[in-house]
Amino acid sequence: MHDLDHTDRTDTSPSGYRLHLTSPTWTHGPAGAVPPASSASSASPTSPAPQYHLWRPLPPGSGDLESLRRERPERRTGAWTLIEADDGLVRLTTDRTRSHHLLFTRAGDTWVISDDPEELRRHAPAWVRDEEAAEVFLHAGFTPGTRTLAREVYATPAGSVVELRPDGNWSSRSWETYRYAADPITSPEEFAGVFRSALDTAVERVLQDIDGRQILVPLSGGLDSRLLAVWLKRHGARDVVTFTYGVPGSSEVAISRGVAEALGLDWFTVDLDPTEVARTWAGPDGVDFQRRTWGLTSLPHVQDWYALLQMRRKALIDSDAVFLPGHTIVGNMHDEHLLEGGPSRNEVLTAAARHHSLLQGDRDAWRHLPLLRRAVVQGAQEVSFPTNPGGDLPGGGRCVQELLEWVNLQERQAKYINESFKAYEAFGYGWALPMLDTEMWRAWLRGSEELTATRDWYAQFTAEVYGEATGTASQLFEAPVARIPAGPRRALMAALTVTGTRTALSRAVSMRTMLRHPMAFEAFNAPMPYAEQILRMARGATSTGLWTQLFLDGTWGAEPVVPMS
């Protein structure tokens, strides 16, 4: 742990701040380095010299800190978090994916800043639950905006700059501008060329950063990891190992193995026994993982946990291996029906809030979650979506798409899905995200609504490049209902909706999957009585919804992790 104390513990000067940074991949800049034009003014002869601290998931190269600081945030590549302190002002800048959260609070006249909730707890003046944020967490799996589960402790958002001032005031603003091109590409072939070029650049840079270390690709039965595996093969990546995990006999494991064999890549699987997973989760390994990964804002992302635990214990992979998950800029749209028919402003804002508050099965939960509604309105302001009643939506469907995707990227993706990277760090591994890098964002935002609002173009593109690489057709893992042809499926769903049986049938199918999941998710439900699980699921709760309840109750593991009062 790096414990960087910039003021004496008894110092009450207005410029005081304390950093408690625990990640081993921080780089600390030389005092007195010349700040870029956008930084605060240079320190006076009597004030402390400027301090700079850069986090990356892989150890940065020589000069990386200075070169990154000189770039504008929107031009920086890779995953990063930057701290700049100069003349009493502390600036915390996060990347688009919020790849490394920072937490901050005020203790007397001193700012306390950390990347570890346990460390912050030791230095914060109080450790009390934020009940309003906890209510959102129950329904969403994350806390919105800058709020955390601890009162008066705050967290950095994605793509933002937080400024902490010596007088105790602070502000947060987005540096990212999420806008689709005014004159977008409409040709699928032209868009494919742009997309290929972006992938080439991002993957080649990641391979240089990895510098010969073993590469691990979590290979599911879906599109994203398959596309990444194809691109690694195209670029001649060495020492690539693919893997998957699941209960023995699951179709996703079989498909994953087939993809690896077709690409000529090494592959292994970790078998999951729900009983053993539940037993291990209830012990010290489970609570330790929760503490290392929740970041005071997010439900711990447990999907990879047991597989990673076995890899580390059994030395299945190199100790300094680098994971390349298939997380991508593609597919952040939801409620696609709003792109047609001219929805009202309120319909769009409601759709965004409702989409992120369904974990307990309550479609009206958003109504009593003012923090979530406020985060949606903030996102609307950041993409210039009208927040005042009346008037048409500028840009039609594209305006709607920008808002729904941006709120998703800022909230659920940044705080829950992307928090899954902390699982790799918890076991001492590195990671990188070539399909979420700067070039990929730029490329995707050049595409037309027809090419980007759904995953249809992307699925076709992936099938084509997979065929080029292997000479075989794609086989994807999909839920049983998805195997029905599109036309009959739409007719079936319409009929079920009219008769009132769609919701009941959907819940019955999802309950069966949740209680016997191909990735043994039911193991994490074990602390909740089985009858209560059934009752909650019948009301529409998801597995994740059960976990948020257990986590907040302090019963998900051997001991509570969150503030309990």
Model-assigned labels for residue ranges:
Residues 1-219, 223-275, 542:
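Cysteine-centered catalytic environments shared across enzyme families
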Residues 4-16, 24, 318, 365-565:
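Adenosyl-5′-phosphate
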Residues 77-80, 211-215, 282-337, 374-431:
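Conserved adenosine/adenylate-binding substructure
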Residues 97, 118, 328-330, 441:
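Short, glycine-/Ser/Thr-/acidic-enriched flexible segments
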Residues 157, 190, 194-198, 223, ...:
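Generic recognition of stable, solvent-exposed alpha-helical segments in well-folded globular domains
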Residues 159-162, 220, 346-369, 377-389:
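Active-site cores of enzymes that catalyze phosphoryl transfer or operate on phosphate-rich substrates
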Residues 180-190, 215, 241-244, 289-295, ...:
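Glycine- and acidic
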Residues 248-311, 327-357, 397-398, 445-449:
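ATP-dependent adenylate-handling ligase core
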